[in-house]
């Protein structure tokens, strides 16, 4: 259970070094490389896998429509859970990255672009991974790490120059994981800077030591508790944040925030729709997710 300490330490050290340069420079530099690499790689892989025997079954699985599934509450619970995970709605990313936005940034438009490109990335991934599974005769309803670490390497192996592609791909995966690690650590680092009035490097060093000691001590026993955190606590916290923003902060505050940086104000219907329709439905689905399972 404690065999991954070395790689855990390596990832932590790299993340802290990037954070010492500041989130604006460190994360931005990493993401400017990571995002184009991911999109280009998946586009190339999508074209390649389309010509492999059996890939058509993967496409049929992806685009098959089951009308009965739309009436199943779990379908919507799973969809919301995927949105929480993929968009990091329940994570520190929204808080941290949002705090670095310029006052001239059109937040609703930026949120729309994030959702659009996230959906494109998810579709590209599906158009590669599911057909790749179909070419090997695997069960297409499988999930978990095997999707990336078993079926994609098999696809790389069949490609001309596949070893080079595999190296580039998993470097990009590493960078994606690193960007997630960075936004998780940025919140406590920023808190120490603000509350204790310490410098950036000193704050990073304190969090690094605490994270290193705690993570090594609990590595072998943490998986069950992490499931509880990601499946229940984070989505619940996100739902409460939505209620606080739309129900407690008040209409004037909300409209001021969402219209900052926009050339044209949002419709007056935005606030009542979010307050009286979106938030209650979202919170209801969160509760159903906790009861029935599926979010996270």
What are the roles of these predicted feature ranges?
Residues 1-20, 24, 56-77, 142-149, ...:
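Inter-helical loop and helix-membrane interface segments of multi-pass membrane transporters/permeases
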Residues 5-6, 117-123, 163-166, 175-178, ...:
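Loop-to-transmembrane helix boundary motifs in multi-pass membrane proteins
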Residues 12-34, 96-104, 187-195, 217-224:
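Membrane-water interface regions at transmembrane-helix termini and the short interhelical loops
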Residues 28, 32-178, 202:
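Membrane-embedded translocation segments of transport machinery
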Residues 39-65, 214, 240-256, 287-295:
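Hydrophobic alpha-helical segments and their helix-loop junctions in multi-pass secondary transporters
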Residues 175-184, 204-214, 230-258:
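Hydrophobic alpha-helical segments of multi-pass membrane transport proteins
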Residues 184-198, 221-224, 243-267:
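Alpha-helical transmembrane segments
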Residues 223-246, 264-296:
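A generic transmembrane alpha-helix motif of multi-pass inner-membrane proteins
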